[in-house]
């Protein structure tokens, strides 16, 4: 079996990488930190014009008809470039959940294809039916509604800003009710695979954070000199840099492999694979970004370094869509249940 990317997927990733480098990066991220979203919003509009924001919307609704793997490739490149845009929510999670809810969600899908932007309301541990008045809105943008997924309906509702750890992807809190709503009687059946897809996309975003932070560290140790030579010449530093590469390549393989499996495997396997992928990438990304900061030395812990932006985004992603402990606890419970509720005590 050939696990390599197709020529079209290689081209998609390359195009997304080039576009992200042109539209975003440290200067745009710094402007957002200062409260100026003009360039970030312009970049988001250009992603929409390029068709990347509607990649997961089916052809019949005006989108690109892409796969989850395609969306994960783009997600990784955008997060590596510190893109302060709602790609993971508006371009990935919302289309997946709307498509999984049945034919009555056509209005949401068509709106995304036409350029509408939504945040995403989630309850604790991604428990969509319980995402009530206290639900957190991910990727909150002032003046934009968030999509709330209920037991048998989709609803757009307003939100206001809320404290969060990641300034590039701010949080909101729901304020009252209102907005459009759509009946979605098939939501319970379709949302399981959609939620699995969202978790895999989050794993791809974490991979992007790790890629960006690792590149910062590699560039630094190649040029920073001590005792008359680059610090990359010292064995201890080389080992740390190599560990970054190992974690990065594993995260990349895990997220992309899981993307294919979630779309093609039975739902029980898809949910387990997505949970493990999200858990692994969450822990690996945070751990390795912290290693990147250590390689950067004193500058790595300053406001002037961009390393803290990658770390803050990674922490928020790791806690979103199900934290590591809750996901692995669920995987373990399912494993025990499959064995008849018994354990032989072996590890």
Residue ranges of model-derived segments:
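Amphipathic alpha-helical regulatory segments at dimerization interfaces
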Residues: 22, 46, 96-99, 111
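Alpha-helical interface subdomain recognition
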Residues: 1-79, 199-347
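N-terminal glycine-rich flavin-associated loop
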Residues: 85-102
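Short alpha-helical interface patches
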Residues: 62, 75-78, 89, 185-192
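Short N-terminal amphipathic alpha-helices
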Residues: 55-59, 83-90
């Amino acid at each position: 079996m050939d696990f390599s990317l197709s020529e079209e997927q290689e081209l998609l990733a390359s195009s997304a990488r080039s576009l992200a480098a042109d539209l975003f990066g440290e200067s745009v991220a710094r402007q957002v930190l200062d409260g100026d979203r003009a360039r970030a919003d312009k970049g988001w509009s250009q992603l929409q014009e390029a068709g990347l924001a509607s990649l997961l919307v089916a052809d019949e609704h005006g989108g690109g008809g892409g796969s989850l793997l395609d969306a994960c490739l783009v997600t990784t490149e955008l997060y590596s470039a510190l893109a302060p845009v709602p790609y993971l929510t508006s371009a990935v999670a919302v289309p997946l959940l709307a498509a999984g809810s049945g034919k009555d969600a056509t209005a949401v899908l068509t709106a995304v294809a036409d350029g509408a932007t939504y945040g995403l309301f989630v309850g604790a541990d991604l428990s969509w039916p319980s995402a009530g008045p206290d639900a957190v809105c991910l990727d909150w943008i002032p003046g934009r509604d968030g999509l709330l997924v209920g037991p048998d309906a989709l609803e757009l509702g307003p939100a206001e800003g809320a404290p969060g750890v990641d300034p590039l992807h701010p949080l909101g809190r729901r304020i009252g009710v209102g907005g459009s709503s759509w009946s979605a009687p098939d939501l319970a059946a379709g949302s399981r695979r959609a939620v699995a897809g969202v978790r895999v996309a989050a794993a791809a975003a974490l991979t992007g954070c790790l890629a960006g932070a690792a590149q910062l560290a590699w560039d630094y140790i190649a040029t920073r000199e001590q005792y008359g030579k680059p610090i990359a010449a010292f064995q201890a530093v080389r080992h740390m840099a190599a560990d970054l590469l190992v974690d990065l390549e594993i995260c990349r393989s895990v997220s992309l492999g899981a993307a294919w499996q979630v779309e093609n495997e039975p739902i029980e396997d898809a949910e387990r694979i997505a949970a493990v992928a999200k858990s692994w990438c969450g822990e690996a990304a945070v751990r390795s970004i912290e290693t990147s900061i250590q390689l950067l030395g004193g500058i790595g812990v300053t406001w002037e370094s961009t390393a803290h932006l990658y770390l803050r985004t990674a922490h928020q992603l790791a806690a979103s869509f199900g934290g590591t402990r809750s996901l692995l606890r669920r995987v373990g419970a399912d494993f025990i249940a499959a064995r008849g509720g018994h354990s032989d005590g072996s590890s």
